[in-house]
Amino acid sequence: TQAVKETYGKMLFYEDKPIEAFYFSTSCGRTADAGVWGTDSGKYPYLRAVEVKEGGKSLGKEDNDGFESYIKREDVIAYDTSYPMFRWQTDLPADVASAQISGAGQIQDMTVTDRGPGGIAGELTVTGTDGTVTIKGQSAIRSALGNPSLIITKKDGGTMTGSATLPSAFIAIEKRTGEDGSLSFHIYGGGFGHGVGMSQNGAQGMAKTGKGYKQILDFFYNGTELRECNEG
């Protein structure tokens, strides 16, 4: 593509140091900061939690009510809105969750008890017949709640299966009881990937609105400078 040609042989720098240019597939309309990996986000000031739309407002931590109402909406305006994984849903049977989350016994409930900037799940508390288990970090939460048998229904109605982890940790969880008394957890989700840095489909969406590569890179890696490799 033209952007690839124009950036060939160049690197992004922040205060004279090459950056960690993290990227992922699709956003939920928001990004996360480097704190999702337990890292001090202050070490990566160019990796911010922002709204992935015109203006790119910076985001702080959010409570469950605010984020849950956001992630359940499919009409959110964002650069990624038109992509199927912008919103997705799945059902996790309690017996499947109980088999792969050790220490809780037969699971009776689960709640997101901490969210990072942008609303990404950072801590999940699981309650069962044997006690309470706390799962921390977006990667661990995605692994705990994912299973290859789950059917992920995308925004466009398409489905995917076979993934051992959830597509992202931008999630809201709703406990449901079936007519037969079986317990399950309905998961509303958005985006695909860890959510830090540049959304590839968000960048595509920006390009479609006429944004150039410099604008796109500055949006996702704020305050950085693109230089020839030999300038560093």
Q: Where do the language-model regions lie?
A:
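Conserved, single-site charged/polar hotspot
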Residues: 1-232
